[in-house]
Amino acid sequence: MAKERAAALRPSAAMSDIIIWQEETTEATTMVLKKGTPSFGGFREIRPQLKRASMAGILSIAELMSVGEFAYVCRKVKNYARKENKDEVYARLDEYFDLITPLDKLENEISRCILSETEVADDASAGLRNIRREIKASNERVKDHLNGVINSSAYRNMLQDFVITIRNDRYCVPVKAEYRSSFPGMIHDQSNTGSTLFMEPLSVIQLNNKIKELQAKEKEEIEKILIALSDMVTANAFAIEGNLELLTQLDFIFAKAKYAKDYNGSKPIFREDGVINIKQGRHPLLDPKKVVPINVSLGDAFSMLVITGPNTGGKTVSLKTVGLFTLMGQAGLHIPAFQGSSLGIYEEVFADIGDEQSIEQNLSTFSSHMTNIVSILSLIHI
C-alpha cells in the first residue's frame, strides 16, 4: 500500500504542504538514527476482508490470520514510538503514532485460535477440543481393529500387503482382487493394474461412520469459531480502517527517510523569493562514489544562469540536478546536498532535453529546441 502511495508521489507548490512533508521526513530520519527502522513486515491490504466481514461474511482461516498479523504490526509500530526520555518530541509523527488504536484483544484471540493459514487450534473452543479428542480416540480404535485383521491368520493370504491405508476418507486394507468375494468388506478403490482392491472390513464400518460424523461436527464447530472471529473483526472494523491508513502513511514516510539516509540527504531550506543555493549537490541517480558535486546559485545576485563547456563536461547533469532537487524538495524528499542548501518554490518545472527534431516540420535541431523554448516561455509566470 505504501508502494502505491510512493508511486503516486507528486510535488506541491503550497508552502504549507512542503513544510509538513519535509518535517515528517526529517523526524523519521532522526528516529531511524536513534531507534533503527520500524518493522512493517506482515502489513498487507486487508480491506477486502473487512468489507466481506461487515456484510456478515465468514472470513477464512488464512484471512483471519492476515488480520491477526496486521494487529501484531500495529502493536509493534505503536511500541516503536515509545519515548525513552521526555525530551524526545516528534511533533508530526507523534500525531500518527498516537492515533494508532491498539488491537491487542483481537490479535490475542486470533493468535489463540489460529495456528496457521490452514489450521485452527484445538483450544479455540472447548467443543472443538472435545470433538478432536473423540476423533483421535476413534481413529485409534479403528487402527487397532484393522491391525487385528492384518494379523489374523484367516485373512493373511487374502491381503496384498500388511498395511492400513485411507481411501475416500475411510480406513481400508489392500486385498488381492481374486478374494473380492471372500473378504467381508466394501470396495472403495483399486490399484492401476486392478490386482489390488482397497476394502473397508465390515467390522469397522460403524467406527468409520462414527469418525465421519465427528468430522462433520468438527467442521461445524470450526465454522462457529470463524464466525465469532469474523464478528470480532467487524466490531473492530473502524479501528482497523484507521490503523490501515496510519500505517500506510508511516510506512511511506519512513521509506522517504530510508531513501534520504541511503544518499546522505539533507532537508532543504525553501525560499518564497525563488532563490536557489545548492551546496555540493549530487545527482540522486548517479553513483555516489563517482558523481561530481556541484554548487549552484541562482536568483540572488543574478536571475539567469548560462552553463557552457565541452561535451560530457556535466552541463546536462547540472541542469537535471537542479530540476530534480526542485521536484524532490517540493515532494517532501530530502536532497543529496550539504545542509543549508536552499530551493525556490515553483508551480511548474519545464525542461528541453536532447534532440527532439521533427522530420515532419522539417526543422533543424536548433530550431526544434527554439520552438520548445518559446512554448515554455509562453507558459512561465514571471
Residue ranges: model-predicted function:
Residues 1-127, 131, 236-239, 243-249, ...:
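Conserved amphipathic alpha-helical "coupling/scaffold" segments
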Residues 380-382:
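Conserved small/polar residues in nucleotide/adenosyl-binding loops
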Residues 150-167, 257-280:
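Long, charged, glycine-rich C-terminal linkers/tails
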Residues 293-343, 369-370:
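P-loop NTPase nucleotide-binding module
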Residues 285, 308, 350-367:
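Flexible beta-alpha connector loops of hexameric P-loop NTPases
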Residues 130-176:
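Extended, Lys/Arg-enriched charged tracts that mediate electrostatic binding to polyanionic substrates
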Residues 274-292:
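N-terminal pre-Walker A segment at the start of P-loop NTPase domains
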Residues 250, 278, 311, 327, ...:
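Conserved RecA-like P-loop NTPase ATPase core
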